[in-house]
A protein has these predicted regions:
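Catalytic cores of enzymes that engage adenine nucleotides and/or redox cofactors via long glycine-rich
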Residues: 1-44
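Glycine-rich cofactor/substrate-binding loops
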Residues: 13, 31-204
Length: 204
């Protein structure tokens, strides 16, 4: 799943991140400009092989009577192959993550290209609680503003359209600042990273 996300984020039109690209490495034999995420692609492909092995293991469950050995031949293939594949995939995944290139300006550009639409859920909650209108009416207001933003972003982003709405005059600028603050999505980031296991510190 992580490698698939990296592949998606490395697309040319976004280029938010890139897996490590070694000097002299070729991304394509025919197109010298390409920097394909070959490691992430390889890991995604091997994950399909592992999925097939897992299916084989499930077929090994029903055995005849006390126990036959129909599972044995399959296990002799899937067990050593699976463990070797998992180790290889983990090592390559660690290499990709440790050397991942993050293009912050491209990330900001992609976020800005949404014209504030990614904050629609937060806007809905604020409109419902601060404007003292029903959730159904709040949803209709935010949705209409969002659809208009999709169609004509040059005439105003989502925030500008909501601030102009007559029914939302009770919502202050400070409230809108909080709604459209991208840092709000990082509120729990320390806790998320805290759940990631870290290798033990080697003894001196």
């Amino acid at each position: 799943r992580l490698m698939q996300e990296i592949r998606l984020l490395q697309r040319t039109e976004g280029r938010e991140v890139e897996e490590p690209f070694q000097k002299g490495q070729k991304g394509s034999s025919a197109m010298p400009h390409k920097r394909n995420p070959i490691l992430a692609e390889r890991i995604c492909g091997l994950a399909r092989v592992l999925s097939g092995y897992a299916s084989t293991a499930e077929y090994n469950i029903p055995l005849w009577h006390e126990r036959d050995i129909s599972h044995s031949g399959a296990e002799r293939v899937i067990l050593p192959d699976s463990t070797a594949l998992v180790e290889y995939m983990l090592l390559k995944s660690a290499f990709v993550v440790e050397n991942l290139q993050v293009h912050e300006k491209n990330c900001e550009r992609v976020l800005e290209s949404t014209h504030g639409l990614l904050f629609s859920s937060r806007a809905l909650l604020t409109v419902t609680s601060s404007a003292k209108i029903s959730r159904e009416d709040a949803y209709a207001i935010v949705q209409q503003a969002a659809m208009e933003t999709w169609a004509n972003p040059e005439q105003g982003n989502l925030r500008q359209r909501l601030e102009r709405h007559a029914s939302l005059s009770a919502i202050s600028k400070a409230d809108w600042d909080q709604v459209f603050d991208a840092r709000s999505f990082l509120t729990h980031i320390d806790g998320i990273f805290g759940r990631v296991p870290h290798p033990p510190t080697p003894s001196p």
